[in-house]
Structures are given as C-alpha cells and as structure tokens.
C-alpha cells in the first residue's frame, strides 16, 4: 500500500 506520512516540520516519508 502506498502511504505518505509527514514527520517533523514537513519531512516527507514515502512508505512502501
């Protein structure tokens, strides 16, 4: 599943 989670002050982490 493609999930985009935002951490910190706008750090984009793309999860597989």
Swiss-Prot record:
Keyword Cell membrane (UniProt): yes
Domain of life: Eukaryota
Subcellular location: Cell membrane
Cellular component GO terms, alphabetical: T cell receptor complex
Keywords: Adaptive immunity, Cell membrane, Immunity, Membrane, Receptor, T cell receptor
GO biological process terms, semicolon-separated: adaptive immune response
Location (main, coarse): membrane
Subunit structure: Alpha-beta TR is a heterodimer composed of an alpha and beta chain; disulfide-linked. The alpha-beta TR is associated with the transmembrane signaling CD3 coreceptor proteins to form the TR-CD3 (TcR or TCR). The assembly of alpha-beta TR heterodimers with CD3 occurs in the endoplasmic reticulum where a single alpha-beta TR heterodimer associates with one CD3D-CD3E heterodimer, one CD3G-CD3E heterodimer and one CD247 homodimer forming a stable octameric structure. CD3D-CD3E and CD3G-CD3E heterodimers preferentially associate with TR alpha and TR beta chains, respectively.
Annotated function: J region of the variable domain of T cell receptor (TR) beta chain that participates in the antigen recognition. Alpha-beta T cell receptors are antigen specific receptors which are essential to the immune response and are present on the cell surface of T lymphocytes. Recognize peptide-major histocompatibility (MH) (pMH) complexes that are displayed by antigen presenting cells (APC), a prerequisite for efficient T cell adaptive immunity against pathogens.
Protein name, as recorded: T cell receptor beta joining 2-4
Species, as recorded: Homo sapiens (Human)
